Structure formats: structure tokens, C-alpha cells
A protein has these predicted regions:
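Helix-to-loop junction immediately C-terminal to a conserved catalytic motif
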Residues: 47
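Catalytic Walker B motif of ABC-type/P-loop ATPase nucleotide-binding domains
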Residues: 147-151
Length: 232
């Protein structure tokens, strides 16, 4: 099977080792590791932020040479910060950069994330959890081939955590590839693959079942009947 994403020798200044990785359409991958291990740096390198090295291809197309409109079709990047500097409405944030022909997509994401009641409010007036839903809707609205999401489940209540996983799974089923940074081990089984990171390197890559013991060792915890617990 041809990979949707091919990343070759990606780096980000001194924070990320030289990495190669591939991902296929329909996959949901979680980057997991302790604070400072390189999850955000890897996402930023794949999103081609300033200072990123190496090459990234999506469906064989080099992302660095794609025009801005094409880049939006190929990938979306949700940074960890939920701050938005623009005093514009929720609907306008979601629709930013789209054409009038995309009205149906915008309305569908507003409905998916239950934002109709706040659609005309400035995004800065919303709670952190509401802003997270708005920015997730914005990331997903163009139905990009690759979704790169930094802690998308942070600040969400239990319902919206599970609903967001459901929406990401639907995006993957429709042909996108999804890579997220994840801290909460309670949700690792929702993902097809885990990439365990430490010191700017991927130290293991496999299914949640395959990496259960390594995951526990990485954090000093172990799986029990009631979930994860401290290793004694």
C-alpha cells in the first residue's frame, strides 16, 4: 500500500532528531511521551514551520513546494495554543481561507462541534474548551489529507473528548491520516498506532497492544483492572 505521508530526515532546529516516517490513509496515530520528548517538535516539523528540515510528501507531492491553497487541501495543523489574535466570529474563523462554495462544509463542522449557539460570537469571548472545539472545526473543515493535531483533547470535557475521537475516526475512515500528540493514556486504545518518543526520537512504533509494556515503562506506570496506576 502506498503511504499517504512520507517524511524523510525531518528535523526542527536542535529539538528533534533526524526522523523518517510514513503513514497511510485511514490511520490514526498518537505520539506519546513525557513532557519535552519532541511530540510538538515532530508535528511542527511535519507541518513545515520555519526552521523545519528534511522533506515531507503527501500523496507524493512535496508540501514545501505546494501553493498555499493546495497546502490547505493537503494538511492542517492545530498548535497547542488555543489563543486566537483575531477579534472575529466563530463562523468566520472556521471559514477563513475557504470559498463561498464551501458553505456546506462550514455548516457541517459547526453542527459536528455543536457551535451554532456561539457562531456569531467573537472567539475570544469563549471558554478554553469552546475555543478548542472551534479550532478543531477549523482544522477539519477543508477535509485535508493529513491532520496534525497538538493535544486536541486537552481542555475538553469527557463528552467532547469522546466525541472528538469519534469525529477524528470518521475523518480517517473518509481517507485522511491523523497524527496527534496525546498525554492521556486512558485513550491510547482509540488509535491504530502509537509512536513512543523520548529525547527527540521515536523509540517504538506499534499498536497499543504491542506497546503496552513499553508505554508503562516510559511513564513509570502499569496497566491494571481500573486503568493505569503508578508502578511500585
Amino acid at each position: 500500500m502506498t503511504a499517504l505521508l512520507d517524511a524523510l530526515a525531518v528535523t526542527l532546529e536542535s529539538r528533534l532528531a533526524c526522523l523518517d516516517l510514513a503513514e497511510h490513509a485511514g490511520e490514526m496515530v498518537a505520539l506519546v511521551g513525557p513532557n519535552g520528548c519532541g511530540k510538538t517538535s515532530l508535528l511542527r516539523a511535519l507541518a513545515r514551520v520555519e526552521g523545519a528540515g528534511g522533506e515531507v510528501f503527501i500523496d507524493g507531492e512535496p508540501i514545501d513546494r505546494a501553493p498555499e491553497a493546495r497546502r490547505r487541501q493537503l494538511l492542517a495543523f492545530l498548535p497547542a495554543s488555543r489563543d486566537v489574535p483575531w477579534p472575529i466570529s466563530v463562523r468566520d474563523i472556521i471559514a477563513l481561507g475557504l470559498s463561498g462554495r464551501d458553505h456546506g462544509r462550514v455548516e457541517r463542522r459547526i453542527a459536528d462541534f455543536d457551535l451554532d449557539d456561539v457562531r456569531d460570537r467573537p472567539i475570544g469571548s469563549l471558554s478554553t474548551g469552546e475555543r478548542s472545539r472551534v479550532l478543531l472545526a477549523r482544522a477539519m473543515v477543508a477535509e485535508p489529507r493529513l491532520l496534525l493535531l497538538d493535544e486536541p483533547l486537552a481542555n475538553l470535557d469527557p463528552y467532547w473528548t469522546l466525541r472528538t475521537i469519534e469525529l477524528l475516526r470518521a475523518a480517517a475512515a473518509a481517507g485522511s491520516a491523523v497524527i496527534i500528540a496525546l498525554h492521556d493514556l486512558a485513550h491510547v486504545d482509540a488509535f491504530d498506532r502509537l509512536m513512543l518518543m523520548r529525547g527527540g526520537k521515536v523509540i517504538a512504533d506499534g499498536t497499543p497492544g504491542q506497546l503496552r509494556d513499553q508505554l508503562g515503562a516510559l511513564f513509570g506506570v502499569e496497566a491494571g483492572d481500573g486503568g493505569w496506576r503508578l508502578r511500585r
